[in-house]
Amino acid sequence: MKAVHFGAGNIGRGFIGALLVDAGYEVTFVDVNEKIIDALNERNEYKVTVAGERKETETVTNVRGINSKTNEKEAIDAIAEADIVTTAVGPTVLPYIAKTIAQGLKQRTASKPVNMIACENAIRATSQLKKDVLSHLSEEETTALLKDAGFADAAVDRIVPNVQSDDILHVTVEPFFEWVVEKPALKGDAVQLGKAVLVEDLAPYIERKLFTVNTGHAVAAYVGYRKGKKTIKEALADDYIKHRVRGALNETKAMLVEEYQFDAEAHEDYIDKILLRFQNPHLEDLVERVGRGPIRKLGPADRLVKPAKYLAEKGLHPESLAETIFDALHFYAEGDPESEELRALVDEKGYVDAFCEISKLEKDHPLVEIVAKE
């Protein structure tokens, strides 16, 4: 079985790529990072350290790489032969790889199933990828393609920090992982996804993860940044920051329990588990890494604004989320284009107007009024 995975970064190698190899696939990583691609082709393997109570290092084999910047034709050919195509490139990059995927799918001659799964921290990223891919195809090509091509949304969860290593391919991950895939959208009777969990309805899993794991991580990062903390572990050692994270997750819990009828007690246990993961003593996750991309993370459907908006519109006061939104408007990470853009926007318009533009909310929206008081 053959898999093509876009994104040979830490998440691609340490999470999705490793799971695909474990499920029996030969994995071709597609990326523009020349050094990583060259190293993959030189060795055809890499090491993953699982940082639990005992550090265990595994070797992931049966891998290779393609530089899509210099060898796009080779990437297209690989897609034409693949059984599965996955991504971990960041949601904003999906439109840029869609044309290559479309060309590879058009080139397929065998009438066998192929499935696309975008493994991104965004709601229904595969659905977005599908739109982007189909925009490069004619109506006839689309009809023919969709007979054999599945586009399955997924929820992904694993902390993969940037850990310094002399080995460019070595990656460190936490023991916990969750890859949940929407089963009805898959094509083929026996899709091999190994340790992935296949579910009939993905929506609850996407939102539970986004509004617990990603929200909690964001709160720790943005509050930690303003408090001068360097790592998430250091941030959560501060009782004030831990209180802020717990407060925000209690607010998102209220939304999730009402929207999806999650058991409140079970969800509280889930929050406890997430907080323990964030405090893993064997992981050094940088505040700057977690906070990067603040404009996307302040978007109307993302981890902070969506739950805060939901609660504010019900007449509730999402204090912890609103405080974090205000903290996020101060965030800056060197080398992060969105940080540069955010700083320029705030300098030009001020915090409240900048927030309105990013969140697509009117100035008289109850959430904006709460944030303005911060």
From Swiss-Prot:
One of its GO terms (biological process) is mannitol catabolic process. GO terms for molecular function: mannitol-1-phosphate 5-dehydrogenase activity. Signal peptide: none annotated. Its EC number is 1.1.1.17. One of its GO terms (cellular component) is cytosol. It catalyses: D-mannitol 1-phosphate + NAD(+) = beta-D-fructose 6-phosphate + NADH + H(+). The keyword NAD applies. It holds the Pfam family Mannitol_dh_C. Keywords: NAD, Oxidoreductase. Gene3D superfamilies: N-(1-d-carboxylethyl)-l-norvaline Dehydrogenase, domain 2 (1.10.1040.10), NAD(P)-binding Rossmann-like Domain (3.40.50.720). PANTHER family: ALTRONATE OXIDOREDUCTASE-RELATED, MANNITOL-1-PHOSPHATE 5-DEHYDROGENASE. Belongs to the mannitol dehydrogenase family. This is Mannitol-1-phosphate 5-dehydrogenase.
